Amino acid sequence: MNFSRILFFVFTCFVALASVSGAPEPRWKFFKKIERVGQNVRDGLIKAGPAIQVLGAAKALGK
């Protein structure tokens, strides 16, 4: 009897979760913000690349 109740409960939870469609997205998109920060860091390194190379060459000449 208890097993059938547990099975029924699990089945109803599964049906309830499977029938949900189009849940609204959360307003605070944490992973999107992290992704944007990573893109900004990458873009900054790309823009600063030539300056870093010049500094590396100058440091090598100074040795």
From Swiss-Prot:
Residues 23-26 form a propeptide. It is found in: Secreted. Pfam families: Cecropin (PF00272). The modification Leucine amide is found at L61. Its main location: secreted. Disulfide bonds: none annotated. The keyword Signal applies. GO terms for biological process: antibacterial humoral response; defense response to Gram-positive bacterium; innate immune response. Residues 1-22 form the signal peptide. PROSITE patterns: CECROPIN (PS00268). GO terms for cellular component: extracellular region. Keywords: Amidation, Antibiotic, Antimicrobial, Immunity, Innate immunity, Secreted, Signal. InterPro entries: Cecropin. Has antibacterial activity. Belongs to the cecropin family. This is Hyphancin-3E. It comes from Hyphantria cunea.
